[in-house]
């Protein structure tokens, strides 16, 4: 990440330092008079042993929030495992280092100990899990009675903004990251007196989230209404939503016994399941409209939507979600976790069986670690933005484990810890108050957020201002100054006539739009445990340590806003092309021409590219706050007549890096670094390590960095493979080599043009 400046450059930097009215739009802050806030980083999709993770709640919280020993600690954290049920007690700690007075180490037990062997089968509630049952505890019970109390205790003990969420197993689809925060972390937790002996009685609760899990998770077949087994003692939940007649529809599975829509099976299960999920969103909107969020996770992974199964999401399903609950369903995780896996993001060719036919993850793989829905300029994300929807981009870790390595090893052949590689930076308007679940969720909802991998950048201000002839004129320098002030203080803007991410700038026809971007590519090393030259960049003669990436360029992407699509219209629903109709055998794609009109926005294109040199070079500017160097850039969009949006992406990869980027700088398919098919591996890793860890050694943070290609890299194969027999870029090296950031959009709404209906 190091940038080298001459004395003259530093001196110059020091000088520089001086559509549809029927759609309900979410509530958002106006462009002026905002509550003060800062960009803070977090993660809302990760796992413990209560679902299918490898570690305890306590170990995960420590790994994720510690900024000294770890050291990639996040500013806020949502623990969110799968819905359904599980048999392991994630509240039991691994060792004495994690022991606390309320949750001490229990001899002979740990986070892989079953519920039956820790609390006893008789304490397991609901149907089927307790005495004589499977030993599995329903997630609603573990959230309500075990996981939430631990999270509240740790939040109070460590003074950290923590809360509990869920990776729902989605009816009709695969997974979504979500939470209902009602009841969680009341202000009284700030002054709670913590116990000095085992046990903690929380002041708040996760009852609303637990009820949602019971009512709507596809893997929850319990009909106990959240009660003690075989009794009416307990929650006595009723999932009826008086705001929706379909909430008790027998056609989609209503159970009078369970007072819920039960999971169904057989022909049409996907279609019925989707309708149930829409009801889940309506329930959230009606009962917890400002206290919940619902973000489809790794949504390309399970393939396209399957009306007779539970697979992926097509664009029409995202539209349905946003239409049903725009304050709740406002984005997606199109940059999945599992970044170190042998199939990056766990996206894979022929991953899924749909109707007996092996079917790719949508797009076949990721593209620079991002799913095709967002990575493809003009694709699904641009189609949604082209409607003027509040549909935002997020990234999360999906932490489970390190693959072939233990949880304390810095290497990985599967996952990264939350904050270690990917993080979402969100503007949280908490004023003088501490960070709290409500202000964090409010921040996510606004879309004033951006995501980066590998700490490629750690600050960003993205600003658009209107300029008119005469007294309303604005210079580039004046807008740059606004952005510099925001970026150097890790905050956003509060200026009339200007907007930032997740907002819209309302202008008169003919206005000039002045766009300024100021960001920081942080000096020094990132959190990679390697320090040898980046092998992907070595292909083009760039010698750059893999743990010191340098931002190569920033793309400004623009698209037109043409209004909301109408349900049932020909351009509302459309499936991304399957298998080789999109991703060909050689790893190239068929391009947007093969994508149906419903799933693309052909007006979207790269409008401007900034880099360190050339006609659109950024300018270094030294912060007056901490003396670090920021990069500033600006341009003008003249005489706008049509509503539109602009968004950003950037990478450490120049254009035309073999097997990484095309000639325009777009990310290529990650099949060339996915170790699940070694015949496709194409980038050799040749630096020999002089400190290669011996077999069985745990490589910890204290050991520093490995100075050559690690032994666990896959070996390329294939008679026609030019690097057959060589260690190839794969697993975590593929991820650390290839870094990207994505911003959310700024909308420009031109009077007498299309209304940007999704944003106030």
Model regions and ranges:
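Gram-negative bacterial Sec-dependent N-terminal signal peptides
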Residues: 1-31
């Amino acid at each position: 990440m190091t940038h080298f400046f001459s004395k003259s450059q530093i001196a110059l930097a020091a000088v520089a330092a001086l559509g549809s009215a029927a759609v309900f739009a979410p509530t958002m802050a106006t462009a002026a008079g905002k509550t003060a806030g800062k960009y803070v980083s977090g993660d809302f999709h990760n796992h413990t042993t209560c679902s299918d993770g490898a570690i305890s709640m306590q170990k995960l919280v420590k790994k994720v929030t510690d900024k000294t020993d770890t050291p990639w600690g996040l500013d806020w954290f949502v623990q969110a495992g799968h819905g359904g049920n599980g048999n392991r007690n994630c509240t039991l700690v691994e060792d004495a280092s994690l022991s606390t007075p309320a949750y001490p180490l229990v001899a002979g037990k740990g986070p892989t100990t079953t519920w039956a062997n820790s609390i006893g089968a008789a304490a397991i509630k609901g149907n089927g899990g307790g005495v004589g049952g499977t030993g599995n505890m329903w997630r609603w019970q573990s959230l309500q009675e075990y996981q939430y109390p631990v999270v509240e205790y740790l939040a109070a003990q460590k003074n950290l903004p923590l809360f509990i969420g869920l990776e729902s197993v989605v009816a009709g689809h695969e997974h979504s990251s979500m939470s209902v925060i009602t009841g969680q972390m009341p202000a009284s937790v700030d002054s709670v007196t913590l116990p000095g002996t085992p046990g903690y009685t929380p002041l708040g609760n996760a009852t609303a989230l637990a009820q949602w899990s019971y009512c709507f998770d596809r893997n929850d077949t319990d009909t106990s209404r959240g009660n003690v087994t075989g009794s009416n003692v307990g929650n006595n939940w009723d999932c009826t939503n008086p705001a929706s007649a379909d909430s008790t529809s027998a056609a989609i599975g209503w159970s009078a016994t369970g007072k819920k829509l039960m999971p169904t099976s057989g022909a049409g299960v996907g279609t019925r399941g989707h309708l149930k999920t829409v009801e889940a969103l309506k329930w959230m909107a009606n009962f917890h409209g400002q206290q919940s969020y619902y973000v489809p996770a790794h949504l390309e992974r399970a393939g396209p939507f399957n009306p007779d199964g539970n697979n992926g999401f097509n664009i029409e399903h995202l539209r349905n979600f946003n239409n049903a609950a725009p304050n709740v369903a406002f984005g997606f995780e199109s940059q999945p976790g599992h970044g170190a896996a042998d199939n990056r993001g766990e996206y894979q060719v022929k991953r899924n069986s749909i109707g007996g036919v092996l079917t790719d993850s949508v797009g076949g793989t990721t593209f620079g670690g991002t799913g095709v829905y967002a990575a493809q300029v003009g694709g699904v994300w641009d189609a949604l933005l082209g409607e003027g929807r509040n549909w935002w981009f997020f990234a999360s870790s999906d932490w489970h484990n390190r693959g072939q390595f233990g949880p304390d090893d810095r290497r990985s052949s599967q996952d990264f810890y939350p904050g270690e590689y990917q993080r979402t930076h969100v503007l949280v308007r908490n004023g003088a108050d501490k960070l709290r679940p409500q202000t964090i969720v409010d921040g996510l909802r606004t879309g004033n957020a951006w995501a980066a991998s590998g700490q490629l950048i750690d600050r960003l201000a993205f600003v658009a201002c209107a300029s008119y002839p005469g007294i309303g004129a604005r210079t580039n320098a004046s807008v740059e100054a606004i952005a510099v002030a925001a970026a150097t203080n890790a905050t956003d803007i509060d200026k009339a006539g200007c907007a930032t991410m997740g907002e819209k700038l309302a202008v008169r026809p003919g206005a000039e739009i002045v766009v300024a971007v100021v960001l920081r590519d942080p000096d020094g090393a990132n959190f990679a445990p390697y320090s040898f030259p980046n092998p992907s960049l070595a292909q083009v003669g760039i010698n750059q340590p893999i743990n010191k990436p340098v931002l190569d360029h920033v793309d400004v992407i623009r698209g037109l806003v043409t209004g909301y699509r109408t349900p049932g219209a020909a351009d509302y629903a459309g499936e991304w092309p399957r298998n080789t109709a999109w991703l060909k055998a050689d790893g190239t794609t068929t391009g947007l021409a093969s994508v149906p009109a419903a799933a693309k926005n052909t007006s979207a294109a790269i409008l401007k590219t900034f880099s360190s040199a050339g006609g659109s070079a950024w300018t270094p500017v030294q912060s007056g706050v901490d003396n670090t160097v920021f990069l500033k850039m600006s341009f003008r969009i003249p005489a706008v007549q049509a509503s539109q949006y602009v968004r950003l992406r950037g990478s450490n990869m120049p254009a035309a890096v073999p097997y990484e980027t095309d000639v325009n700088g777009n990310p290529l398919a990650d099949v060339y670094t996915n170790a699940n098919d070694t015949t496709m591996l194409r980038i050799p890793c040749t630096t020999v390590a002089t400190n290669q860890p011996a077999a069985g050694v745990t490589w910890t943070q204290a050991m520093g960095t490995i100075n050559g290609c690690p032994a666990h890299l896959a070996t390329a194969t294939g008679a026609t493979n030019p690097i057959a027999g060589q260690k190839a870029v794969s697993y975590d090296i593929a991820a650390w080599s290839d870094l990207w950031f994505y911003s959310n959009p700024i909308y420009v709404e031109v009077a007498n043009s299309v209304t940007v209906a999704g944003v106030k």
